[in-house]
Amino acid sequence: MCDDEETTALVCDNGSGLVKAGFAGDDAPRAVFPSIVGRPRHQGVMVGMGQKDSYVGDEAQSKRGILTLKYPIEHGIITNWDDMEKIWHHTFYNELRVAPEEHPTLLTEAPLNPKANREKMTQIMFETFNVPAMYVAIQAVLSLYASGRTTGIVLDSGDGVTHNVPIYEGYALPHAIQRLDLAGRDLTDYLMKILTERGYSFVTTAEREIVRDIKEKLCYVALDFENEMATAASSSSLEKSYELPDGQVITIGNERFRCPETLFQPSFIGMESAGIHETTYNSIMKCDIDIRKDLYANNVLSGGTTMYPGIADRMQKEITALAPSTMKIKIIAPPERKYSVWIGGSILASLSTFQQMWISKQEYDEAGPSIVHRKCF
């Protein structure tokens, strides 16, 4: 494959909350936009405005007042293919401004993605977008590659779902993967709830975006939750103020760390699940005893919901408490982990050794969609 812009591979990481897309070899995605498709609630109110039948991403977000918004990816898994096709179309033609039939395309998938889903992705890429070649890679595996490793356990937490994925020599170990349906969106909802208890009202989708911003700017993970609660109760040292778009200033105190504490104590939002430190430990314990040492020493954090200050230290403390006392435990929290899945895809798709791994149009025509199970694992 020649190295000119014409045949550069595309990398598209489809998350529940955000689509990250760009060109292989780049160090960051060119396009990052919300994974939403909006359709007008009422037909043609604006005469002659050339109203479209659907809007994608930021445009859907800004026009949400007149639209019904749908997320085609729920908990990391694509559930609405018509809308997903619109998102891919928007990614290629409006965001990256490329003709997909000229570029090999690397897509990402959630761990334990159903077989039928991988086939459907493959089929749409070849039949609707006519890509010359494609590949489907597991998100957590790409994050591990981005950190320069091929063995380790990834905690990948985004907007819709959290996974613990142990990986040995580049292969995810499916029997030990843990999935937790608690992620960024749930934390935003919980912050809305506890701010409402404080007397601030956040209810609409527009207000939810404000709360998400508060969460991203002010929340952090406490090393010792009880201690932090005591500190917050006895002094105002942990309080921060935030200016709302209308100029009103609100003060936020223990909510700053009560919100992400939910990751360690899902009972805060009424879930019976174990926290992320326990799911990590459980995942390691489901692996062969001989590789556990390598997993403990290579705990890689990935995804937007692992961006809270203090989360790595807290994980270190919690896992040390669960693991055998002599075990060396290391948490790796790369600064760019918000995009590490995409970055791993960019690295993989530009490796010379990877070029034989692509599923070509010819192979697809000969074998059909099931080729994906033979070539991508």
From Swiss-Prot:
List-wise, which residues carry N-acetylcysteine? C2
UniProt PTM comment: Oxidation of Met-46 and Met-49 by MICALs (MICAL1, MICAL2 or MICAL3) to form methionine sulfoxide promotes actin filament depolymerization. MICAL1 and MICAL2 produce the (R)-S-oxide form. The (R)-S-oxide form is reverted by MSRB1 and MSRB2, which promotes actin repolymerization.
Q: Which residues carry this modification: N6-methyllysine?
A: K86
**Principal location class:** cytoplasm
Methionine (R)-sulfoxide modification sites are: M46, M49
Q: What is this protein called?
A: Actin, alpha cardiac muscle 1
- PROSITE patterns listed in its UniProt record: ACTINS_1 (PS00406), ACTINS_2 (PS00432), ACTINS_ACT_LIKE (PS01132)
Could you share any additional remarks the record makes about this protein? Xenopus contains at least three sarcomeric alpha actin genes that are preferentially expressed in either heart or skeletal muscle. Due to the tetraploid nature of Xenopus laevis, each of these three alpha actin genes is present in at least two copies.
Molecular function GO labels: ATP binding; hydrolase activity; myosin binding
**Which compartments is it annotated to reside in?**
Cytoplasm, Cytoskeleton
According to UniProt, the reaction catalysed is: ATP + H2O = ADP + phosphate + H(+)
Q: Which Pfam families match?
A: Actin
Single Gene Ontology BP term? Answer: heart contraction
Question: Is Isomerase one of the keywords?
Answer: no
Keyword Nucleotide-binding part of the UniProt annotation: yes
Describe the subunit structure: Polymerization of globular actin (G-actin) leads to a structural filament (F-actin) in the form of a two-stranded helix. Each actin can bind to 4 others.
Q: In which tissues is it expressed?
A: Shows overlapping but distinct expression patterns with other actins. In tailbud embryos, expressed in embryonic muscle (myotomes). In adults, expressed only in heart muscle.
List residues, modification N-acetylaspartate. D3
Q: Give a GO cellular-component term.
A: cytoplasm
Q: What is its EC number?
A: 3.6.4.-
* Organismal lineage: Eukaryota, Metazoa, Chordata, Craniata, Vertebrata
Please state what class of enzyme this protein is.
hydrolase
Please explain the role this protein plays, according to its UniProt record.
Actins are highly conserved proteins that are involved in various types of cell motility.
The chain residues annotated with the modification Tele-methylhistidine are: H75
* Keywords, sorted A to Z: Acetylation, ATP-binding, Cytoplasm, Cytoskeleton, Hydrolase, Methylation, Muscle protein, Nucleotide-binding, Oxidation
Q: Which InterPro entries does the protein's record reference?
A: Actin (IPR004000), Actin/actin-like_CS (IPR020902), Actin_CS (IPR004001), ATPase_NBD (IPR043129)
Q: Which family does it belong to?
A: Belongs to the actin family.
